[in-house]
Amino acid sequence: EAAATAGVGPMAAVAGAIAEYIGRRLKTEYDCREVIVENGGDIYADIVEGMDIPVFAGQSPLSEKVGIFIPEGGRISICTSSGTVGPSLSFGMADAVMIVCSDAALADSYATAFANKIHTKQDINNVIAEIRKIPAISGAICIKDDMFGICGEYGLKIWKQPLIR
């Protein structure tokens, strides 16, 4: 259903759906206060406080230097797709498209759909405009080479040095 909504094949929703399923089971079966499950760039989180989310974008000079701040706790899904990083099939060349939704399968599907639409950095503005029209998406970052676009309800975070390495 999520993949059909985003206009992609059903496999585009699998990693996000699995992350959310595992996260919800951990939370209920083990009475965890907080849960964060990461599955190949797709995150399901049920958190008490806010958190920073940097974006890994491969060889882009913006990789791990831009991201968002989730200001408060709750259930959230953050999924990323790329045409230049990792083994997954992509019809685009985005270094990273990160989508934030309440539903992980939907976030995963939309990340794939919008990553497929970015071939050059000139595509970013049109993709961001398209993302803004979708009420289910609460935030997004698109990265290609040295350019990025952001939209949604979360604040932009910038780091001088990559956080991960």
Give the ranges of each region predicted by the language model.
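Flexible, glycine/charged-enriched surface loops at secondary-structure junctions
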Residues: 33-34, 121-151
